[in-house]
């Protein structure tokens, strides 16, 4: 028997039987996921009001409200039990009544403890779910906004919206909202009990409430402005900090550390002043609430003591009244602090709502046509474009046709309009006038996502995510095989350099690819663009940051890969333009010259002069400097 029993325990503690193991394997995984409709949040549009946002969560909040109501009711029971214990047990010399009141008070305290625990857990989880939903909504909206928004708004200010401003809502939803609900319920319940116990004493206790109400109205008006200013200043601090960190090499190279510190101190002091203003308003209001609570207590003690002396009120009732007054003004003071949290949250919500109210400057029209595969014919028909707030056109009446499979270089001086033209082709911008066409179709009539899926885009400033090299190359095609990733890297001449890194393709590049050289980052960006097998390649001088040896290698790779694909390159080096099928010179937002390299070299225009200057610099032994000095645009 003993051996059988021991064997049973061994079986119980060891591996389960195969049938049980199979059933366990079929069980769904245990997940602690928030009850958030992510699809709804992603599709949500327009400004956000706190009332509307809270209404979406009325079910979970109703449960929290029930727990809050129970908390308030249990709080009302305590002073009544104290009155019973004093009047019936102590004054009445009834030990059983005193014991009953004491045990009842203990039971109420235990239930209140459980209720507060459940209330904290439930409201905390609900609050975190609400904040998660808001973060999803805000991030999805940020992904939709056009380039004009990001060119207008500092990155630090955008980060503030997603972090600090949402954190102010977190304090309200997880703590402040519960405190406010408990406070309101407690104040109403206590007021009702006070009038039930003694009307005269209740009026004495509540006489200060009109003064507190008037102070609250004034506080609301002043605090709203103070906290708006505070949110603006913290965003300015974050924006300056992010810009300073991003440009630290320039700051140190030019010895501008002290100037940067002085600017930061100026912004920091402005934030401090805004915070102190808000703090001063809050301190004045909280101190006034404390003063009024003391006045109410003194009034109850004075009037109540007189009633006890005249035998119109029992001692236990007066003690209960004093306890209720303490309970009355504790939530009132808590409401004052909660109102401070509410004002902070409201200021943050206004900033978040301002971002959510931003309309994407570029979006798919209703019923937009999805495109499977473009031939690659591109055209600009009478295109003009003006940036918001600009006094002049960036592009003016541009007509340009690019045949499928043609490789075209855009050249010109800085500010000529080349980058704007490339952004229009990528549909980062829509023209102010005219049409941009792909295969004869207006880009505004095409589904934006399906159109951009046809593009391979490489910016002049290479950007990599904090991930492995393989993940960065496969960013536009996450399901790509290792062989496909390697093939793209080989095509741009990056394979050997990647293999030489620790971990090879699994090497983590760090934020913005900081563990790689500028040339390596650009090669990875090129491989990323090529991996999606685009119908159209848009390159903002993809070789501008490469040394001469890598430049020749990548130029050869681009020439091979561009075969059969429409390619538009902003050429900062005329050596790049020389290898293209066609060259377009852009000046003052217009097409100045258009032809092959051979044609333009003999046309006597801007291109010929720039080319001759480049050749002269090469002959003088300053190839890199000459090329950059005469052809960068």
What are these regions (language model features)?
Residues 1-76, 90-104, 119-123, 127, ...:
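Membrane-integrated ABC transporters
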Residues 35-43, 66-67, 74-83, 87, ...:
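Juxtamembrane helix-loop junctions of ABC transporter transmembrane domains
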Residues 48-51, 59-80, 84, 101, ...:
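Alpha-helical segments in transporter systems
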Residues 55-59, 147-148, 164-173, 177, ...:
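An intracellular "coupling" helix at the cytosolic face of ABC transporter transmembrane type-1 domains
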Residues 59-115, 195-200, 298, 302, ...:
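Transmembrane helix-loop-helix hairpins at lipid-water interfaces of multipass membrane proteins
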Residues 60-70, 175-229, 300-313, 330:
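Transmembrane helices of ABC transporter permease
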Residues 104-116, 209-216, 282-296, 302, ...:
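Hydrophobic alpha-helical segments in the permease module
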Residues 364, 371-633:
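ABC-type nucleotide-binding domain
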């Amino acid at each position: 028997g003993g051996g059988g029993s021991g064997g049973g325990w061994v079986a119980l503690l060891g591996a389960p039987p195969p049938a049980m193991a199979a059933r366990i394997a079929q069980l769904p995984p245990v997940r602690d996921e928030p009850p958030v409709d992510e699809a709804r949040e992603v599709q949500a549009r327009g400004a956000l009001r706190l009332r509307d946002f809270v209404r979406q969560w009325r079910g979970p909040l109703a449960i929290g409200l029930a727990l809050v109501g129970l908390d308030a009711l249990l709080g009302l029971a305590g002073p009544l039990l104290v009155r019973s214990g004093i009047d019936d047990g102590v004054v009445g010399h009834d030990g059983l009544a005193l014991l009953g009141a004491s045990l009842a008070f203990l039971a109420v305290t235990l239930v209140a403890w459980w209720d507060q625990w459940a209330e904290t857990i439930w409201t905390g989880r609900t609050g975190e779910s609400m904040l998660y939903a808001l973060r999803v909504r805000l991030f999805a909206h940020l992904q939709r906004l056009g380039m004009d928004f990001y060119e207008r708004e500092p990155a630090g200010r955008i980060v503030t919206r997603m972090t600090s401003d949402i954190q102010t809502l977190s304090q309200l939803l997880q703590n402040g909202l519960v405190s406010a609900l408990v406070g309101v319920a407690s104040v109403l319940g206590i007021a009702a009990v006070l009038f039930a116990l003694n009307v005269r004493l209740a009026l004495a206790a509540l006489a200060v409430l009109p003064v507190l109400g008037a102070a609250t109205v004034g506080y609301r008006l002043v605090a709203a402005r103070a906290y708006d200013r505070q949110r603006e200043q913290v965003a300015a601090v974050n924006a300056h900090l992010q810009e300073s960190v991003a440009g630290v090499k320039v700051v140190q190279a030019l010895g501008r550390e002290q100037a940067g510190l002085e600017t930061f101190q100026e912004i920091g002091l402005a934030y401090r002043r805004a915070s102190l203003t808000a703090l001063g308003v809050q301190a004045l209001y909280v101190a006034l609430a404390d003063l009024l609570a003391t006045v109410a207590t003194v009034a109850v003690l004075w009037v109540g003591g007189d009633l006890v002396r005249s035998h119109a009120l029992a001692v236990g009732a007066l003690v209960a009244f004093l306890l209720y007054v303490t309970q009355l003004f504790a939530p009132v003071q808590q409401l004052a602090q909660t109102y401070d949290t509410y004002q902070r949250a409201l200021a943050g919500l206004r900033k978040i709502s301002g971002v959510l109210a931003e309309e994407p400057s570029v979006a798919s029209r209703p019923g937009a046509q999805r495109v499977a595969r473009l031939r690659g014919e591109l055209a600009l028909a009478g295109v003009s474009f003006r940036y918001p707030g600009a006094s002049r056109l960036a592009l003016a009446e541009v007509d340009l046709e690019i045949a499928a499979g043609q490789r075209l270089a855009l050249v010109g001086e800085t500010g000529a309009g080349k980058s704007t033209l490339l952004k229009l082709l990528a549909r980062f911008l829509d023209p102010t006038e005219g049409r941009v066409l792909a295969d004869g179709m207006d880009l505004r009539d095409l589904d934006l996502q399906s159109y951009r899926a046809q593009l391979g885009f490489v910016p002049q400033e290479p950007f990599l995510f904090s991930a492995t090299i393989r993940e960065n190359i496969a960013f536009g095609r996450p399901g790509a095989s290792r062989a496909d990733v390697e093939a793209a890297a080989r095509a741009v001449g990056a394979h050997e350099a990647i293999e030489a890194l620790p971990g090879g393709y699994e090497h983590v590049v760090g934020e913005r690819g900081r563990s790689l050289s500028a040339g390596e980052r650009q090669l990875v960006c090129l491989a990323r663009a090529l991996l999606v097998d685009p119908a159209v390649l848009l390159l903002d001088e993809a070789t501008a940051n490469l040394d001469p040896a890598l430049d020749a290698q990548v130029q050869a790779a681009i020439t091979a890969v561009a075969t059969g694909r429409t390619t538009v390159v902003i050429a900062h080096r005329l050596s790049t333009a020389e290898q293209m099928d066609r060259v377009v010179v852009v000046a003052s937002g217009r097409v100045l010259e258009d032809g092959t390299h051979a044609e333009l070299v003999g046309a006597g225009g801007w291109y010929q002069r720039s080319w001759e200057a480049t050749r002269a610099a090469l002959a003088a032994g300053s190839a890199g400097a000459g090329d950059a000095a005469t052809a960068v645009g």
